[in-house]
C-alpha cells in the first residue's frame, strides 16, 4: 500500500516540475490532481504545506542550471561580472518587494479561492491575456524594448514584481503573471522568462518557510512517512524541472506564448464544465 503512496508522490513531483515553469499554473494543476489522486490518511494541514514546500525541488533546479550566473563569488569572475551579478540580485530583490506586503493574506486567498471554479477562471483569463498580447504585438509590429537581462531597468523589475502579487490567486501561475507583466512593459520573451526563473528563488523559499512555520505553529509534526513522501516529490520535481526549464528557455527563442494561452483556455473550460456537472451528480 505504501508503494502506491510513493507513486503518488512521484506523480505530484512530475506535475510540479512541469507546471511550475511553464506558464500554466502549478497550484492549479496540483489542485486538479488532488481531485482525483489523494494521499491516504493525510490531513488538510499537511497537504496545504506539501503543495507549497514541494516547490523547493523545482527552484533548486534553477539554482543548479544558473549557478554560475547567480554566484557573485565565482573566482573566475572579474569585477565587472561580479557587479553585474549583484545588480541582478538587486533587481530580483526589488521585484520581490510587492509580495512582502501581501504574504500575510495567503491564508485568506487559500480559503476563498482554493477551489476548482476559481482555478478554471484564472486559467481562462490569463490564457486570453497571452493570446491577446501576442496578437497585439504582432499586429502593431511592436519590438521589445528590453532584449538583454543586464539592461532590464530597476523600474521594470519592480513592475514585473507587481504582477507576482496576482499569482496569489490559484490558477493564475506565478510565471504566467510575470510574463504578462513583462510583455506589457516591452520586455522580450527570453528576458522575462529567465527573470521569472530567478524571481522564484526568494518567493518559493519565503513561501515554504511561511507554510512550515504555520504548520508547526498549529501543533503539527511531520511523521517520517510524511517527510519521505515530501522528499520524493521534491526530488522528482527537481529532476523534471531541469528538463522543463531548458525546454521553455529554448522554446521562447522561436515561439510565442499563444500555445500556452490556448491550453489554459481549453483546460479552464473543461474544469468549469466538470464543476458544473458535479453539482448535479
Swiss-Prot record:
Its EC number is 3.6.1.27. It catalyses: di-trans,octa-cis-undecaprenyl diphosphate + H2O = di-trans,octa-cis-undecaprenyl phosphate + phosphate + H(+). The keyword Transmembrane helix applies. One of its GO terms (cellular component) is plasma membrane. Its main location: membrane. GO terms for biological process: cell wall organization; peptidoglycan biosynthetic process; peptidoglycan metabolic process; regulation of cell shape; response to antibiotic. Pfam families: BacA. This is Undecaprenyl-diphosphatase. It comes from Streptococcus pneumoniae (strain ATCC BAA-255 / R6).
Amino acid at each position: 500500500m505504501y508503494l502506491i503512496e510513493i507513486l503518488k508522490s512521484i506523480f505530484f513531483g512530475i506535475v510540479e516540475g512541469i507546471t511550475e515553469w511553464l506558464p500554466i499554473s502549478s497550484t492549479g494543476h496540483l489542485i486538479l490532481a488532488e481531485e482525483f489522486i489523494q494521499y491516504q490518511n493525510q490531513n488538510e494541514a499537511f497537504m496545504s504545506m506539501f503543495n507549497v514546500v514541494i516547490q523547493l525541488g523545482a527552484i533548486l533546479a534553477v539554482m543548479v542550471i544558473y549557478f554560475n550566473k547567480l554566484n557573485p563569488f565565482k573566482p573566475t569572475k572579474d569585477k565587472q561580472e561580479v557587479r553585474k551579478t549583484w545588480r541582478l540580485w538587486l533587481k530580483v530583490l526589488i521585484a520581490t518587494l510587492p509580495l512582502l506586503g501581501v504574504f500575510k493574506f495567503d491564508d485568506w486567498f487559500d480559503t476563498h479561492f482554493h477551489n476548482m471554479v476559481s482555478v478554471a477562471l484564472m486559467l481562462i483569463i490569463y490564457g486570453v491575456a497571452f493570446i491577446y498580447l501576442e496578437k497585439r504585438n504582432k499586429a502593431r509590429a511592436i519590438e521589445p524594448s528590453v532584449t538583454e537581462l543586464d539592461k532590464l531597468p530597476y523600474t521594470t523589475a519592480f513592475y514585473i514584481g507587481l504582477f507576482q502579487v496576482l499569482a496569489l490567486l490559484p490558477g493564475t501561475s506565478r510565471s504566467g503573471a510575470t510574463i504578462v507583466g513583462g510583455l506589457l512593459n516591452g520586455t522580450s520573451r527570453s528576458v522575462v522568462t529567465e527573470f521569472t526563473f530567478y524571481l522564484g528563488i526568494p518567493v518559493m523559499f519565503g513561501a515554504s518557510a511561511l507554510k512550515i512555520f504555520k504548520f508547526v505553529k498549529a501543533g503539527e509534526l511531520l511523521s517520517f512517512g510524511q517527510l519521505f513522501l515530501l522528499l520524493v516529490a521534491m526530488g522528482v520535481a527537481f529532476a523534471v524541472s531541469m528538463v522543463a526549464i531548458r525546454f521553455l528557455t529554448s522554446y521562447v527563442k522561436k515561439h510565442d506564448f499563444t500555445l500556452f494561452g490556448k491550453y489554459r483556455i481549453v483546460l479552464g473550460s473543461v474544469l468549469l464544465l466538470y464543476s458544473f456537472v458535479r453539482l448535479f451528480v
